[in-house]
Every structure is written in C-alpha cells, then in structure tokens.
C-alpha cells in the first residue's frame, strides 16, 4: 500500500472507530460484562460493525464478549461457505442459524412484490430467539447515520411521524436491548472501508425481491443534497440530536395549554414575530472547517 493511500486508510479507520466509540459512550450501549450478539448479514455495514467491535474490545475500559450470528434463510445462491471461512480465519465465536424463511415469504407474497417487510419480521423473531438461546445481553446491528436520516424522512413523508431509527432501544418483545454502534458513522466511510478491507460481501438481493422504492427515492434525494449542498446531511443529523419539543406541535410531548406569560423577561427566549436567522455553516467532516462548526458535544 502506497504511503499516501495508507495514510488515507488509517485516517478512515480511525474516524470509523472514533465514531463508534463515541456513539457507544454517548448512548451507554455497552456495559462491563456484556455478551453481545453481532448480527452479520455479509454486507458492508455488518462486516464493518464486527471489525470495529473487535478492535474496541481490545482497547475499551470495560470487558465484553462477542458472538457473530448469521441467519441463513435458504435463499437461492446463498454462499454458505463464505461467512464460516471468514469467521474461522478471524477466530471469532459464531453461530449460523438455518431457517427457511425464503419459502414462507414466496408462499405469502405475490410474485414481483416487495418481500422485505415480511422477511424482516420473520428474521427479527428468529434473531430474538437466538439471542435468548445464546444468553446475549445486547444485540448489535450495523445501521449507520445515513440509515437513520433516511428512516426519519421515510416516516415523515409516508408515515406522518417525526420518528427515526434509535441508536439504542428495547426490543418490541421487551426481552432484549438492541444497539447500533455505527450510529455516527457515514455510509460513504463504510463503503470505502469495506472496499479497502476487501470484505467477502454477500449480495443482498439473492431473494429476487424488488428494492424498496420509497427508501431508494429518499436515498437519491439525500445524495443529491449532499452533492449540491455540502454540510446539509451533517446539519440534518445534528438536528436529530437537538430536538426542542416546545417548538413542534405534539401536545403529548409539551403542555402547550399550560403556557402563560409570567411577566419575566428572558433574553434568550424566542421572539414571536421574528424569523430565525442561521449563521452556522455546516461542512462535511472532510472539510478543514468541520470541527469549528459542530457543537463540542458532537466531537470526539
């Protein structure tokens, strides 16, 4: 590897590891003694997640164990040997769960329709069961910053909700804690890292399902913004960490009926008849001015 390329790779690797470490710390994702089940699909995100957690396991101030789990859903053409060979080479504890969800999905969903929703529900149930069998205290998923932003817009545009993908949550069955250590990582960084590491990627469309058109459109919109307006994606993600319930319209989050004029001036209060002015110019992390334009609490 040439000197310049090696420097670029080291910088990329350090950024991903730093982002993951910060997310883990900010959201209290990993505790001493945790046994973490890392869901490994064979895609760039889950490979990067496992690689990053293996590194952090060596340097973290707390002790935790890892077990990689892959769900073989018996999709046609699934390369069964790829993940075992990779994990054996790494010396990582792992479990391959074989469940023929492919046949169930094909039976229930008409030809040509998107199967992702049913497939996801089936997969989730199997992974929850597996986590219980392995006595895992946390389930780690490989979703990243861009997934979270895409989900925010999907819910706003198509679900009428201001809701994204949380970095940490209790599972819907109430039995598990799910964490997303790559919550701060950029997809473009993960793509570059995955290519540089030459992970043995397994295609995600072996089932033949049509791509989720709504998510595809959101991704195209965000990619367009990222190119046309550098820093907009960074600003969007920072906004997700600076929610002001009193300035939205959800009465379940803020008691608007209780708002009264108390006669006390507040120099930091909002001016009802003035429009907000914005002076912060968010740039991408590749920009030399990035660090000076992001609130300190969002830096490493």
UniProtKB/Swiss-Prot annotation:
Binds 1 [4Fe-4S] cluster per subunit. The cluster is chelated by three Cys residues, the fourth Fe has a free coordination site that may bind a sulfur atom transferred from the persulfide of IscS. Gene3D superfamilies: HUPs (3.40.50.620). Keywords: 4Fe-4S, ATP-binding, Cytoplasm, Iron, Iron-sulfur, Magnesium, Metal-binding, Nucleotide-binding, RNA-binding, Transferase, tRNA processing, tRNA-binding. It is found in: Cytoplasm. One of its GO terms (cellular component) is cytoplasm. Its main location: cytoplasm. A motif (PP-loop motif) lies at residues 41-46. [4Fe-4S] cluster binds at residues 116, 119, 207. Catalyzes the ATP-dependent 2-thiolation of cytidine in position 32 of tRNA, to form 2-thiocytidine (s(2)C32). The sulfur atoms are provided by the cysteine/cysteine desulfurase (IscS) system. Homodimer. HAMAP family: TtcA. Belongs to the TtcA family. The thiolation reaction likely consists of two steps: a first activation step by ATP to form an adenylated intermediate of the target base of tRNA, and a second nucleophilic substitution step of the sulfur (S) atom supplied by the hydrosulfide attached to the Fe-S cluster. This is tRNA-cytidine(32) 2-sulfurtransferase. The gene is ttcA.
């Amino acid at each position: 590897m040439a000197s310049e390329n090696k420097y670029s790779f080291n910088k990329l690797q350090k950024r991903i590891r730093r982002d993951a470490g910060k997310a883990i710390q900010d959201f209290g994702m990993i505790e001493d003694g945790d046994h973490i089940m890392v869901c490994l699909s064979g895609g760039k995100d889950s490979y990067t997640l496992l690689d990053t957690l293996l590194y952090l396991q060596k340097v973290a101030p707390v002790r935790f164990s890892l077990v990689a789990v892959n769900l073989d859903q018996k999709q046609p053409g699934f390369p069964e040997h790829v993940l075992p060979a990779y994990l054996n080479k790494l010396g990582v504890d792992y479990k391959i769960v074989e469940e023929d969800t492919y046949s169930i999905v094909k039976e229930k969903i008409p030809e040509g329709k998107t199967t992702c929703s049913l497939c996801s529900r089936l997969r989730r149930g199997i992974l929850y069961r597996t986590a219980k069998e392995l006595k895992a205290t946390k389930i780690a998923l490989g979703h990243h910053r861009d997934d979270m932003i895409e989900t925010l817009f999907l819910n706003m545009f198509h679900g009428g909700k201001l809701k994204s993908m949380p970095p940490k949550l209790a599972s819907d069955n109430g039995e598990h804690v799910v964490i997303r250590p790559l919550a701060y990582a950029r997809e473009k960084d993960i793509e570059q890292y995955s290519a540089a590491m030459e992970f043995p990627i397994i295609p995600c469309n072996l089932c033949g399902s049509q791509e989720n058109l709504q998510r595809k459109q959101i991704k195209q919109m965000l990619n367009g913004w990222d190119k046309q307006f550098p820093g907009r994606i960074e600003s969007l993600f920072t906004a997700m960490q600076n929610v002001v319930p009193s300035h939205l319209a959800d009465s379940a989050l803020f008691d608007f009926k209780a708002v009264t004029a108390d006669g006390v001036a507040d120099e930091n209060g909002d001016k009802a008849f003035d429009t907000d002015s914005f002076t912060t110019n968010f740039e991408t992390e590749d920009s030399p001015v990035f660090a000076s334009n992001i609130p300190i609490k969002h830096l490493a």
